[in-house]
Amino acid sequence: MGVKIDINRIARDQFILVDNQPYKVVSYEHVKPGKGQAFVRVKAKNMRTGNVTEFTFKSSDSIELADFEQRFMNYSYTDGTYYYFLDTNTYETFAVPAEAMEHEAQFLKEGMQVVVFLDRGNPIGIELPKHEVYEVIETEPGFKGDTATNTLKPAKIETGATVQVPLFINVGDRIKVDTEKGTYIERVNK
């Protein structure tokens, strides 16, 4: 059983338990209506299913924090149903269900170090590095002088994900991507 905290102390990226289901807080908002009691609106991702749900709590409520073990592991491979990660300290392999990693899966590359969350020894989800460098494998060609950064085009990166990039990005360029938002940050020198 986790520690209970006042709902007003909730923070982004905290792990909470709602109806015995583990969630990661994506966003929250304190609302004080003109009439009636203040409340907190919480958007949270179910760590087992990957679904994002919105909850509303009275400002007087308390919520239970989930207590997960966090381990650094390296991504190995997928069989379509599970994603497999290697704990480099114990050489144990852990399988995370694909449905729990819908967003994260598109930015995983072989050997990438991630944080795996374990609930009583069972993996329930991962956290990618905030920023990661990827190679562009497919995009429309850029032209010399295309330096306007407010116009974007789609580019496919080595993992198969598509990211919107400035016009000057070409196939073979390496780019830094915000893995949480799936957005381009900058071009990286080779």
From Swiss-Prot:
* Localization in the cell: Cytoplasm
Q: Name one GO cellular component term.
A: cytoplasm
One family from Pfam that matches here is: EFP_N
Give the pathway listed in the UniProt entry for this protein.
Answer: Protein biosynthesis; polypeptide chain elongation
Gene Ontology biological process terms, A to Z = peptide biosynthetic process
Query: Keywords in UniProt for this one?
Result: Cytoplasm, Elongation factor, Protein biosynthesis
Tell me where it mainly resides.
cytoplasm
**Single GO MF descriptor:** translation elongation factor activity
Q: Which InterPro entries match?
A: Elong-fact-P_C, NA-bd_OB-fold, Rib_uL2_dom2, Transl_elong_fac_P/YeiP, Transl_elong_KOW-like, Transl_elong_P/YeiP_cen, Transl_elong_P/YeiP_CS, Transl_elongation_fac_P
Gene3D superfamilies, per the entry: 2.30.30.30, Nucleic acid-binding proteins
Which family, according to UniProt? Belongs to the elongation factor P family.
Q: Mind telling me which NCBIfam families this protein's record contains?
A: efp, PRK00529.1
Q: Which PANTHER family match?
A: ELONGATION FACTOR P, ELONGATION FACTOR P (EF-P) FAMILY PROTEIN
Function, in words = Involved in peptide bond synthesis. Stimulates efficient translation and peptide-bond synthesis on native or reconstituted 70S ribosomes in vitro. Probably functions indirectly by altering the affinity of the ribosome for aminoacyl-tRNA, thus increasing their reactivity as acceptors for peptidyl transferase.
- What name does this protein carry? Elongation factor P
Biological source species: Sulfurihydrogenibium sp. (strain YO3AOP1)
